[in-house]
């Protein structure tokens, strides 16, 4: 069910990150070198999840693996226990909660009209539902973390914190973000561009669907313009 996916991606996955933040407070901040294997594992897991996204043909699975890859960055930032790392982790968790939930919502609107989640069968929606294409573009840009979005603020803080802790981590972080941009572009082009493969009549997006996406993106834009609200 799409509601379960939205709650899982937006709230439950982030509760795990919040739990790690609370648990890490019992460890001394001077001994973060001991956690090097876990940081490497988190960043490597983020890269593997991103690579899995690139080969996905199922739209919903692609968005789910995207959430996992972002949580890898969050876990790595939390473990080093620096103020910038914790601020970046909180910012990215909140921003990606809105983004991934909006992506699941958009995937459901596509599924209700095509009755399939296979990427190659959902193309051509920019000809039929141009406003939906606009929502897809905005949400994918947030997923890529373009400035001045909250996603960008979170990833920039995480990159800075990890680079100060160990400069070698920039290689894994850069690779992860490059693959994120690749699969986000692939997802947008696969669902919106190209010729329409539907033979049946497609109903337009309802007002409630536009309202639902607006309720995801409006708070995200608000905290992007005023990050002091959350970090």
Swiss-Prot record:
It comes from the Eukaryota. One of its GO terms (biological process) is electron transport coupled proton transport. The keyword rRNA-binding does not apply. Disulfide bonds: none annotated. It holds the Pfam family Proton_antipo_M. GO terms for cellular component: mitochondrial membrane. Its EC number is 7.1.1.2. Keywords: Electron transport, Membrane, Mitochondrion, NAD, Respiratory chain, Translocase, Transmembrane, Transmembrane helix, Transport, Ubiquinone. It catalyses: a ubiquinone + NADH + 5 H(+)(in) = a ubiquinol + NAD(+) + 4 H(+)(out). GO terms for molecular function: NADH dehydrogenase (ubiquinone) activity; ubiquinone binding. PANTHER family: NADH-UBIQUINONE OXIDOREDUCTASE CHAIN 4. Core subunit of the mitochondrial membrane respiratory chain NADH dehydrogenase (Complex I) that is believed to belong to the minimal assembly required for catalysis. Complex I functions in the transfer of electrons from NADH to the respiratory chain. The immediate electron acceptor for the enzyme is believed to be ubiquinone. Belongs to the complex I subunit 4 family. This is NADH-ubiquinone oxidoreductase chain 4. It comes from Crotalus concolor (Midget faded rattlesnake).
